[in-house]
Amino acid sequence: MVGLVPAGSAWGGRALAVLGVTLLVALARGLLPFFLGGRDLLWGQSGEASVLGVVEESRRVVDGAIQHTVRRDLSKRGLPSPSQLLSFSKLPEPTSRAVSRAAEIMEASVQAVRTRVYGKLGRSWPLTDTLPEAVLDTIANASGCRPHMLPPRCPDTCLARKYRLITGACNNRDHPRWGASNTALARWLPPAYEDGISEPRGWNPHVLYSGFPLPPVREVTRQVIRVPNEAVTEDDQYSDLLTVWGQYIDHDVAFTPQSASGAAFGAGADCQLTCENRSPCFPIQLPPDASGPACLPFSRSSAACGTGIQGAFFGNLSSANPRQQMNGLTSFLDASTVYGSSPALEKQLRNWTSAEGLLRVNTRHWDAGRAHLPFMRPPAPLACVPEPGTRGTAGAPCFLAGDSRASEVPTLAALHTLWLREHNRLASALKALNAHWSADTAYQEARKVVGALHQIITLRDYVPKVLGPEAFQQHVGPYEGYDPTMDPTVSNVFSTAAFRLGHATVHPLVRRLDARFQEHPGLPPLGLQDAFFPWRLLKEGGLDPLLRGLLASPAKLPVQEQLMNEELTERLFVLGSSGSLDLASINLQRGRDHGLPGYNAWREFCGLGRLHTRAELRSAVANATLAGRIMDLYGHPDNIDVWLGGLAEPLLPRARTGPLFACLIGRQMKALRDGDRFWWESSGVFTDEQRRELARHSLSRVICDNTGLPSVPADAFQVSRFPQDFEPCENIPGLNLDVWREALPQGDACGLPDSLDNGDVVLCGEAGRRVLVFSCRHGFKLQGPEQVACSPRGGAVRAPVCRDINECEDASHPPCHGSARCRNTKGGFRCECTDPAVLGEDGTTCVDSGRLPKASLVSIALGIVLVVGLAGLTWTLVCRWAHAGRKASLSIAELGGRGAPPPGRGAGQDGASGSLVPPLGPQGRTRAVDPTSSRSHVAQGSPA
């Protein structure tokens, strides 16, 4: 035994040595590439191909999540769920979707880099670490984010100086992105994220704020905000139209797209189903004692390119460039609700065959000879679904307008329709006055007037009623001209909190009135849950009954203990029994999603002073009961969500909001006015005579000119009684368009060219000279000069050419999803799918239709025909064979009968049998008998 120990020890040592070397080799093979790769990524020595691989993998992850969402929505049978309807109503137009997708690909790429570089090292991601500039550029370019992070190219033409760009870009020549569509919302205070960069407050329910957890937003709704419909107090001063105008104008200046995907990237969690916080899913948790699901679906707003997790690697590390949200619209009061905020949407909205510069109208439905909004072209959202069982309304498409939310409620669609009619009325009249104008000039001049009327009605008639005269004077004040240092970009707190004060003024009923402004006998009042989406506008009386109801019905008064009616908190977007949504909880959750600082921070911002105790809150809201409920939920004034805090304040004198929202709304309206180079009062935008005519106009006059109402209130926002408060339309001042008459100067040397195919020509004058400005429609590129000065010698001007852009050749930003193939069309492109896949609602992604390919169906049909044919042929052959067999048997029988012995005699000598069958021989063979011989022979198988 003693002799075996050394031997065993030696053997064990050799084994351990071999094992150690093996482990070292394995570790070297496994870890060395990682450390080298990490070093390369961190210190800029990685090849571009590896970075592109990360981006491409991230693209597949994001597109997979998007495709899952599209497939889920397309496969939905029956009525959509409330959360699907909400996502449909927030579906951005294609340009915004492309920007949102690019931002999510970039975010996923940076996440992947973080995981690869730091995750395998077993340590957290330090915000102070940055990626090399070359790597950042590669990610930004490959993801598609780079073009949306750079200043746009501003055209230097007479036309660009005369009319605003459809995107809002280049309004400020020194800051061309200010107020432009698809740029980040402005921050007036640094955001408040739980991790300092991206995660919302409340993402981790165990995190405490001032020693207290944040209350679930649904609990805030239940205990503070919700009020039964029957308990609503009506406004004795202002009409429902004031509320609807506020919603309409909100949709003119702000739209924040949700995440392009409704599923967690890489994790596969569906935001419609999961109750976990897995970006972009941020579900609204329900109380444990609530029946039904444990949460309400909620998707985060898409991040702007280069912000949040992606932004931590960019520029200013002291602020870490936290997550920002995108505004898909122009910030300006420019009637983008009518004309859109992108060239692609503007192209869809215009009637390109008219010489008057008209907008498209509905060709299937008319309202007593007046136009309706056109329908969206397929593929269109499935959201605009009628009530089940309603005859003649199945499959009504959504309306197409400058904003995708035009179809949400009939009252909102009514205002969109009103302004569509007003544009076409103005464009036709202006073209009649100026026969030499091109269609584009008539369109642009009418658009300019409609935009000015939006500005006048909002700043002159709407905002002072909301803020009250004193707060309006304090925060907005008189117009003193264009201020190029004023940033007009809509702020996050305005769009996400302050301007949502209008939700507290929504009446639970939509009322439709007859010509005497009485309840319409055939059109009873509708609860909001029965009034979503557009078909009632088409099938139930058109605009006039709705507008009568808006003019003569009071709005809901925003009473402190009646903040929001239960039509919005309990039955939002309900079309069936598939659940509900809660608008109040959505507003609170959206504020946290956007990183809005709390109520106290904004009070300090507006000079109102911070609150520290329950008693101070009670004093600020002047309501002990309400203050007690809020403090019981939040624990400390610092924790109160800004939207709730602003709503809880008592109304200012002759106002419909408290001091905080008056400050925030007033500040934003002043920025929208003073920071807009094309504001209607700005020098050079209109002539003095034109400004005087515009100042005479009103919303009441617009209603007179575009509906069948013979009389209206002088102030459309003042709740009015019929007939004493109504004026005949002939007494309501309107525009005298003669001041827009433009006579060509005598001896004008400009020879107008023939119409420019797929483009427009505008005669423009500036600095004492006249020029021709050429532009191409969306999808075409100008080849030749943009602008040509008129020659003193006269003569025809040779126009440039508009060439089609082949979007399908853009490999860096393919217009179609990888699941689809791109086909170039004149002025655009078309995404096509291989059967049985079909295009999803985004128009670019192919999803499974749930059926067999058409070719397979044809093959199956042909196969069935072939099988049936073969079966028939086989049956025919069998029948013929059987028939032939029977005939053969009969022939044998007949033959046997003729060769049989006479009756009474058997075969052979015994005569005992009358059988026709010959006697069997040995082994069962028949024995033939030769009648001529006494001898016999054996026959094989057949008679002789």
Curated annotation (Swiss-Prot):
<feature type="region of interest" description="Disordered">
    <location>
        <begin position="895"/>
        <end position="944"/>
    </location>
</feature>
<dbReference type="InterPro" id="IPR018097">
    <property type="entry name" value="EGF_Ca-bd_CS"/>
</dbReference>
<dbReference type="GO" id="GO:0004447">
    <property type="term" value="F:iodide peroxidase activity"/>
</dbReference>
<keyword id="KW-0106">Calcium</keyword>
<dbReference type="InterPro" id="IPR035976">
    <property type="entry name" value="Sushi/SCR/CCP_sf"/>
</dbReference>
<feature type="domain" description="EGF-like; calcium-binding">
    <location>
        <begin position="804"/>
        <end position="847"/>
    </location>
</feature>
<keyword id="KW-0893">Thyroid hormones biosynthesis</keyword>
<feature type="disulfide bond">
    <location>
        <begin position="808"/>
        <end position="822"/>
    </location>
</feature>
<dbReference type="InterPro" id="IPR029589">
    <property type="entry name" value="TPO"/>
</dbReference>
<comment type="pathway">
    <text>Hormone biosynthesis; thyroid hormone biosynthesis.</text>
</comment>
<dbReference type="InterPro" id="IPR019791">
    <property type="entry name" value="Haem_peroxidase_animal"/>
</dbReference>
<keyword id="KW-0479">Metal-binding</keyword>
<keyword id="KW-0732">Signal</keyword>
<dbReference type="GO" id="GO:0042744">
    <property type="term" value="P:hydrogen peroxide catabolic process"/>
</dbReference>
<feature type="topological domain" description="Extracellular">
    <location>
        <begin position="31"/>
        <end position="858"/>
    </location>
</feature>
<dbReference type="Pfam" id="PF03098">
    <property type="entry name" value="An_peroxidase"/>
</dbReference>
<keyword id="KW-0325">Glycoprotein</keyword>
<feature type="active site" description="Proton acceptor">
    <location>
        <position position="251"/>
    </location>
</feature>
<feature type="disulfide bond">
    <location>
        <begin position="154"/>
        <end position="170"/>
    </location>
</feature>
<dbReference type="InterPro" id="IPR037120">
    <property type="entry name" value="Haem_peroxidase_sf_animal"/>
</dbReference>
<comment type="similarity">
    <text>Belongs to the peroxidase family. XPO subfamily.</text>
</comment>
<keyword id="KW-0575">Peroxidase</keyword>
<feature type="binding site">
    <location>
        <position position="332"/>
    </location>
    <ligand>
        <name>Ca(2+)</name>
    </ligand>
</feature>
<keyword id="KW-0408">Iron</keyword>
<dbReference type="InterPro" id="IPR000436">
    <property type="entry name" value="Sushi_SCR_CCP_dom"/>
</dbReference>
<keyword id="KW-0245">EGF-like domain</keyword>
<feature type="glycosylation site" description="N-linked (GlcNAc...) asparagine">
    <location>
        <position position="141"/>
    </location>
</feature>
<dbReference type="GO" id="GO:0005615">
    <property type="term" value="C:extracellular space"/>
</dbReference>
<feature type="binding site" description="covalent">
    <location>
        <position position="250"/>
    </location>
    <ligand>
        <name>heme b</name>
    </ligand>
</feature>
<keyword id="KW-0560">Oxidoreductase</keyword>
<feature type="binding site" description="axial binding residue">
    <location>
        <position position="503"/>
    </location>
    <ligand>
        <name>heme b</name>
    </ligand>
</feature>
<keyword id="KW-0349">Heme</keyword>
<feature type="binding site">
    <location>
        <position position="330"/>
    </location>
    <ligand>
        <name>Ca(2+)</name>
    </ligand>
</feature>
<dbReference type="Pfam" id="PF07645">
    <property type="entry name" value="EGF_CA"/>
</dbReference>
<feature type="compositionally biased region" description="Polar residues">
    <location>
        <begin position="931"/>
        <end position="944"/>
    </location>
</feature>
<keyword id="KW-1133">Transmembrane helix</keyword>
<dbReference type="InterPro" id="IPR000742">
    <property type="entry name" value="EGF-like_dom"/>
</dbReference>
<protein>
    <recommendedName>
        <fullName>Thyroid peroxidase</fullName>
        <ecNumber>1.11.1.8</ecNumber>
    </recommendedName>
</protein>
<dbReference type="InterPro" id="IPR001881">
    <property type="entry name" value="EGF-like_Ca-bd_dom"/>
</dbReference>
<dbReference type="GO" id="GO:0020037">
    <property type="term" value="F:heme binding"/>
</dbReference>
<feature type="binding site">
    <location>
        <position position="336"/>
    </location>
    <ligand>
        <name>Ca(2+)</name>
    </ligand>
</feature>
<feature type="glycosylation site" description="N-linked (GlcNAc...) asparagine">
    <location>
        <position position="623"/>
    </location>
</feature>
